């Protein structure tokens, strides 16, 4: 799950498909928009709540919305969300530094860029780098930078 369509756009879909991984950005989902209005929360927070209902393993890729990162941490701490990992690199001044520090200090498996810097492009690059270094034999060399001899 990504917090922005921009992050999702930068992720290698062919590789995700090859791995059998589904990918979603719920920020424009009508259910998310309605929930955000009803609860008076950000759409990013509502998207995390909706994603929590997915029983499959999840990785959250957050490059823009510190509120999404805060919601992930809160829900994990309250045993309302299970996530395999989080890439937490929201950019900005408001809550970005604090949310990333909180993720860093949590027990959630994560890649975090501490401080103000980050962004959707970095989030996409990080998940792509993780995928590029996965089992190349399973993926086939046409999807990776490496070729096993």
Where are these regions (language model features)?
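Glycine-rich, small/polar surface segments that engage phosphate groups of diverse ligands
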Residues: 2-46
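Buried hydrophobic positions in well-ordered alpha/beta secondary-structure cores of metabolic enzymes
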Residues: 3, 87-88, 126
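Structural signal for hydrophobic packing residues in well-ordered secondary-structure cores
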Residues: 8, 27, 55, 76, ...
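Short, well-ordered, mixed-charge alpha-helical segments that flank or form enzyme active sites
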Residues: 8-10, 32-34, 68-71, 93-96, ...
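Short, solvent-exposed amphipathic alpha-helical segments in soluble enzyme
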Residues: 14-19, 74-81, 101-105, 127-131
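Short, acidic/small-residue loops that bind anionic groups at enzyme active sites
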Residues: 22-30, 81-97, 108-115
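Long, charge-patterned amphipathic alpha-helical coiled-coil/hairpin "stalk" segments used as oligomerization
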Residues: 42-99
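C-terminal functional extensions of proteins
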Residues: 94-149
């Amino acid at each position: 799950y990504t917090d922005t369509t921009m992050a999702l756009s930068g992720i290698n879909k062919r590789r995700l498909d090859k791995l059998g991984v589904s990918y979603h950005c719920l920020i424009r989902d009508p259910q998310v928009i309605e929930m955000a209005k009803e609860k008076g929360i950000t759409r990013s927070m509502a998207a995390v709540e909706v994603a929590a209902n997915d029983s499959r393993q999840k990785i959250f890729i957050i490059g823009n919305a510190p509120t999404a990162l805060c919601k992930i941490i809160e829900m994990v701490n309250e045993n309302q969300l299970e996530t395999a990992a989080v890439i937490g690199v929201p950019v900005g001044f408001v809550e970005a530094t604090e949310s990333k520090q909180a993720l860093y200090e949590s027990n959630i498996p994560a890649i975090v860029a501490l401080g103000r810097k980050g962004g959707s492009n970095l989030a996409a690059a990080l998940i792509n780098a993780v995928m590029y270094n996965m089992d190349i034999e399973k993926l086939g060399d046409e999807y990776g930078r490496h070729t096993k001899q």
